[in-house]
Design a protein with these regions (language model features):
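Hydrophobic h-region of N-terminal signal peptides that target proteins for export
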Residues: 9-18
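Flexible metal-binding regulatory segments at protein termini and peripheral loops
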Residues: 2-6, 19-170
Length: 170
């Protein structure tokens, strides 16, 4: 009898593991090993979640027993300044930034992922294509930076998100 109960428990454990859900976020800005580490750090506190960042593909694969945990992982990545497209419509990548869709002369951006010089270059390239942006103070490791010019705040975040980055307007 003990063997049967143990066998059933083992079968249920295997079945539960096989039922894990996997969602891939694509088009995420992951330019270096520090970005890969940043992904791991961002989701470290999400219990039951496994995250795998692929620098070459620009993807983050999230695996957990349920979509609630995966959603927490996606939310943690956004809070850390990463952005991408979800392979599962049930997992929403929060695009809210606080931008008001208004023309501004300056704006402070917080929590955009800036771990290295390549991240700063990516920000500069994005902002160079936003009409009206004339300057910024983005720097490696910065928690916030200023953008100046005469530009639409929402256009800035739309461009960041298209490039796999995000942040919040302060």
């Amino acid at each position: 009898m003990k063997i049967i109960v143990t066998s059933i428990a083992l079968a249920l454990a295997i079945a539960a593991r096989a039922a894990d859900t996997t969602v891939t976020l694509t088009d995420v800005h992951i330019c270096c090993p520090s970005c890969v580490k940043g992904v791991a750090t961002a989701v470290a506190d999400v219990k039951g979640l496994t995250a795998k960042a692929d620098q070459d593909a620009g993807t983050v694969t999230l695996t957990a027993a349920d979509t609630t945990t995966i959603q927490k992982g996606a939310d943690a990545l956004v809070a850390a300044g990463f952005f991408g497209k979800s392979s599962d419509a049930a997992i929403k990548v929060n695009a809210a930034t606080g931008a008001k869709d208004k023309t501004v002369e300056s704006m402070t951006v917080e929590n955009l992922h800036l771990c290295c010089g390549k991240c700063v270059t990516a920000v500069n390239n994005v902002l160079g294509n936003v009409p009206g942006v004339t300057g910024n103070t983005a720097a490696k490791g910065a928690k916030s930076f200023e953008i100046t010019g005469n530009f639409n705040d929402k256009d800035v975040f739309d461009a960041f998100q298209k490039a796999g980055l995000t942040g919040q307007e302060k």
